[in-house]
Amino acid sequence: MTVPSKTIAPKTLYQKVWDAHIVATPEGEAPIIYVDRHLVHEVTSPQAFSGLKVAGRQLRAPEKTFATMDHNTSTRSASLDALSPMARIQVETLAQNCKDFGVLLYDIHHPNQGIVHVMGPELGITLPGTVIVCGDSHTATHGAFGALAFGIGTSEVEHVLATQTLRQLKAKTMKIEVRGQVTDGVTAKDIVLAIIGKIGMDGGTGYVVEFCGEAIEALSMEGRMTVCNMAIEMGAKAGMVAPDQTTFDYLEGREFAPKGEDWAQAVAEWKTLKTDVGAEFDATVVLDAADIAPQLTWGTNPGQVVAIDAPVPNPADEVNPTIRSSMEKALDYIGLTAGTPMTEVAINKVFIGSCTNSRIEDLRSAAKHAKGRKVAAGVTAIVVPGSGQVKAQAEAEGLDKIFIEAGFEWRLPGCSMCLAMNDDRLEAGDRCASTSNRNFEGRQGRGSRTHLVSPAMAAAAAIAGHFVDIRKPY
């Protein structure tokens, strides 16, 4: 008798990584998944470590936990004296906790210190097919490598430290395909802002998104990280890009990446991490890359975004009363009038940095627009590299000199002006061209007005004193 062969259903990239990490699925409960890498920083970890101490527990796998100081650190000085009292307590507490529990720490004096989502990938801590968590909402950044990466809360941070596992419900799957190639002046930041503008800030809620298509495949790893970084801004649990030769070339030789024979074996396994032909997604979104222009936000959430050659939207044109009301509120806060060309919106602050856009490719892009020019009168512009490695490389290439000669401030690594949690913040009424990921009310300081843009658009705005279409002479 012939026994029929068992057919294996085609799987998405997310399903493959998910299935490989299930530890147990207790009846009536959420599955328990294994965590390969745990990244911690000074803001969301103190209570977690305290919980371990109270319970008398040790770390389940200290060698899989990596710590850095980034959110509250000063970008003006590496001295503890430059920190606010609360920030100093947090960084000193992290240092003590890492010492007590045997966790590798990249403190403010370490040459590789930086934003957790910048230094993790550049050190090779981030690897394809792994599950990565961090007490930070932009952990999705690491999904650019084909990892399943997402943010967790402080109680979950403690649970991972103690068990190296998490209870998680399986998410739905969404494919976002960007077909064709972008035109000159359009970057990864513009791609992801266009996506969010299309599906809204809650369009990805409940999903893990896989970004694909020719435009995504053409991106560098830096660009893919920018796209995945903002998956949370469309409401998604995580964002992923299938690993390919671009991924392998980026990772080879990095400190924590496999070496020798292990490298060859790892690459062979990573090459299987792609969505199978015939695998079904719960939702699919398609964009034509050629239709994407440089983007910038006009309102108070990342979904309120338009192309640079468009005017400020008019709420009166919106038929949905809830959306119309939100638009009216946003315009009132942001201080713009419907119908105003975005190229006529003046700015007085520029921030180039954050876990979205502070990598070497981002700084090179901004420097092209700053070279040989001067920051406009009345504009304060700062450039904050994402890590010590990025800073050193930029300085080796002379990018720091280009920025400084143009009138930009060249800073130390850190989260900086992305959030009003350190000494880099906006004053009420300031209008900022920012390469960060959130433009919520008060995000960069009480009463501040934030417009999300690419590094090239931010640098150009600093020079012109207002937003410009970088595809044209200015």
Curated annotation (Swiss-Prot):
Pathway involvement of the protein, from the record: Amino-acid biosynthesis; L-leucine biosynthesis; L-leucine from 3-methyl-2-oxobutanoate: step 2/4
Assigned EC number: 4.2.1.33
Coiled-coil boundaries: none
Amino acids binding [4Fe-4S] cluster: C355, C415, C418
Membrane-spanning ranges: none
Cofactor(s) listed in the protein's UniProt record: [4Fe-4S] cluster
Keywords: 4Fe-4S, Amino-acid biosynthesis, Branched-chain amino acid biosynthesis, Iron, Iron-sulfur, Leucine biosynthesis, Lyase, Metal-binding
Note on how the cofactor is bound: Binds 1 [4Fe-4S] cluster per subunit.
SUPFAM superfamilies per record: Aconitase iron-sulfur domain
One Pfam match: Aconitase
Functional note: Catalyzes the isomerization between 2-isopropylmalate and 3-isopropylmalate, via the formation of 2-isopropylmaleate.
NCBIfam families registered for this protein in UniProt: leuC, PRK05478.1, PRK12466.1
Assembly and binders: Heterodimer of LeuC and LeuD.
Protein's UniProt name: 3-isopropylmalate dehydratase large subunit
Native source organism of the sequence: Shewanella oneidensis (strain ATCC 700550 / JCM 31522 / CIP 106686 / LMG 19005 / NCIMB 14063 / MR-1)
Gene it is expressed from: leuC
